[in-house]
């Protein structure tokens, strides 16, 4: 029913499929370097509340300014260099967002040290029936990865996670699956349970 509803909302099955990001295998997610996770987190942070195409157009410059998101190199970046990068006209000059690059590099490094495996392996090992657990981990330990920012980044990277878009939230509310704030623990658990049931039903 949800799939039929989505097709109707988006103008047919073909149009819907064109909008859906391709999910990747666990093997792919394991091999994906920590630099790519950090890059996508950063991209989504800058796209949040901003014109996406402007970020996309400047993205090659972001890669250059932040050393292709080399985590180890970014960890050693001193404060004065971070401030200079935040003023670089080649990127979008927003210091509070630029700071997240080093902060999320620290989160990735801390995760790898604690778990004794790569960040990609940690993401790939996360249970599919607890995606909200991964969302909450990123929100708690990362910087500006709450709301839909972290989940959108994961989905773009190929993680098989649902997203609480306005359409999805509207559907969940209209079917009395969610009746509280969408970011509340209660709502997240209800949404996760619903999508787990859908996964089981679809095989």
Description of each model-found segment:
Residues 48-54, 108-116, 177-178:
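Short helix-capping/linker segments at secondary-structure and domain boundaries
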